[in-house]
Amino acid sequence: MANKTPKFLIGIDLGTTNTVVAYADMAKALSPENCKIFEIEQLVAPGEVAKRPQLPSFRYHPAKGELKENDLLLPWSDKLNDDLPTIVIGELARELGAKVDGRQVVSAKSWLSHPQVDRSASILPWGAADEVSKVSPVLASASYLFHVRQAWNTSHPDALMEHQEVVITIPASFDESARAFTVEAAKRAGLSEILLLEEPQAVCYDWYARQGNHAQAQLAKIKLLLVCDVGGGTTDLSLIKISKAKDDSLALTRIGVGNHLMLGGDNVDLALAHTVEQKINGDRPAKKLSTSSLSQLIQQTRKAKEKLLGNNPPENTKVTLLGSGARLIGGAKSYLLQQQEVSDIALDGFFPVININEQPVKRRSAVVEFGLPYAPDPAVSKYLAQFILEHQSACHDAINSTQPEEIATPDALLLNGGVFNSPALNERAQKVLSEWKTGNITLLENSRPDLAVAQGAVAYAKARRGAQLKIGGGSARTFFLALEKTDSGQQAICLMPKGAEEEQEFMLKEQKFSLRLDQPVKFHL
């Protein structure tokens, strides 16, 4: 029988492109070394199960008879309630989706934060044919967490995941509805007691834990840190003030959070897909790709991007656009994507070197053909500039500026997200920030940006137990309760101010409330 007393601290990075799990054994000292990546069992080929450090956040809905029952066997037999009877999750789902048109669910995390759709409705795969079974963004997210939970429980039958302390990370820019849908997905996956942590903070926790006793010395001359987390579907920005407490100990306080920005590696993949489509068609008039065909092409351009922007890249790699229907193979067309083309799009299109006063282009709508409301301007650099300018008051305060007429900029940068596995993009982001600052900007080392968030979630759980420094800053937003309109207009009561710390209570002693009996009421926050 499983012990319900927590034995492990578990951090889950529920990513747009990959899900990662890290953990620490509570029976051991909660030192930085006490943190491991949990390798997740998953299908990697039909009938073949293997452990991987990441679970690709992809689902594949096979056609009837496409895969044999034995091809889909996992080390566990439990199924997620209300899910489809036949699905593939993880590496095999990613590979099948790159070959078969219109049956892959991608970017479920981005859909969780899409306010213009019903996130509980069965809409994914987006744009798929009527005969393809669909699921909601909430259920898709729950299925990844359920898979992770089953893999963990199979490996730890005496310490089930639902009985451990679990921290799930989310973008700092997630609004309350997106956070609530994440909690709902976790509950549907069997994880009813979880903690949420903002991803940029998780990155900071991981960095601090890895530096150990050297952290204080490395941050001694730094006053303002920018955390730039560019994932598959979102860009997450946070400002961290670094100061000394009264006892001369280090104090880290989050002082700024960026708006929700649906701009990330997926956008690069989409731009590359359009480039390949145009090159293949040449001057011939071509029918616009269906959503499902575009999805299949994007999976291939994603792989090409990672190869051509990685270490020791080849000069080119082949990308194939499959035909459809009876012409699936015969109608296939290929293009040799050059390393320089990818570099031009990823660096100059998404991380151009600009003046800090250059603002993002504002349009009525962004790239929405793939279903998601992408940011209207593809240049991450411009949103970085906008974010820093919008937080000038906090920036000046953090660096103790005596020249308010000058633009205050961060003096340190911490990069995260799979995008920054590319040395070229890493260097470009640093160059962009350096152009805005007199003197060099300090780049804090992050050797595994694909694992840092999950590891940071574990470090946060340790910090809650006093094992390391805890980042302050509290709530990123102020919460008001809207009251009924009066002759003097709309009024509201502040329930929780921005900066409120975890478990801090606020008593509304001066406010009297009236009760309305036997009538339905709504509370507008």
Give the residues covered by each predicted segment.
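Conserved phosphate-binding catalytic cores of ATP/NTP-utilizing and phosphoryl-transfer enzymes
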Residues: 1-7, 196-228, 399-404, 451-470
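Acidic, glycine/GT-rich loop-and beta-edge segments that sit at the periphery of enzyme/chaperone cores
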Residues: 6, 14-16, 219-220, 278-329, ...
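Phosphate/ATP-binding catalytic cores across multiple sugar-kinase/actin-like superfamilies
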Residues: 143-159, 206-216, 349-409, 428, ...
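Conserved phosphate-binding/catalytic loops in two-lobed NTP-binding clefts
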Residues: 189-202, 373, 429-456
